[in-house]
Amino acid sequence: MKPEIHPVYPPSRVTCMCGNVVETKSTRGSFSVEICSNCHPFFTGKYKLVDTAGRIDRFRKKYGASPTSAKKA
């Protein structure tokens, strides 16, 4: 490998909204995520509602689209 071309790869912390903290290495540093393997329904077997209605409402507000304005072919 060539010297002095690789980025610094320090330890970092990934924090989930459920409170789970994972220690890893990353060039990004510490950051947070919404869902991790500790709280994801696939791994836990429990159903968890993820709020996507807010994203849809923001999209409609931004672009002026309404559910009834969709054209049917």
UniProtKB/Swiss-Prot annotation:
Gene Ontology CC terms: ribonucleoprotein complex; ribosome
Cystine connections: none
Keywords: Metal-binding, Ribonucleoprotein, Ribosomal protein, RNA-binding, rRNA-binding, Zinc
Cofactors (names): Zn(2+)
UniProt superkingdom: Bacteria
Pfam family, one: Ribosomal_L31
Single GO biological process annotation from the record: translation
Transmembrane segments: none
Residues annotated to bind Zn(2+): 16, 18, 36, 39
GO molecular function: metal ion binding; rRNA binding; structural constituent of ribosome
Gene3D superfamilies: Ribosomal protein L31
PROSITE patterns, alphabetized: RIBOSOMAL_L31
Co-factor remark: Binds 1 zinc ion per subunit.
Record-stated family: Belongs to the bacterial ribosomal protein bL31 family. Type A subfamily.
Subunit (UniProt): Part of the 50S ribosomal subunit.
Functional description taken from the UniProt entry: Binds the 23S rRNA.
Matches recorded under NCBIfam families: L31, PRK00019.1
PANTHER family cross-referenced by the UniProt entry: 50S RIBOSOMAL PROTEIN L31, CHLOROPLASTIC (PTHR33280), LARGE RIBOSOMAL SUBUNIT PROTEIN BL31C (PTHR33280:SF1)
Protein name: Large ribosomal subunit protein bL31
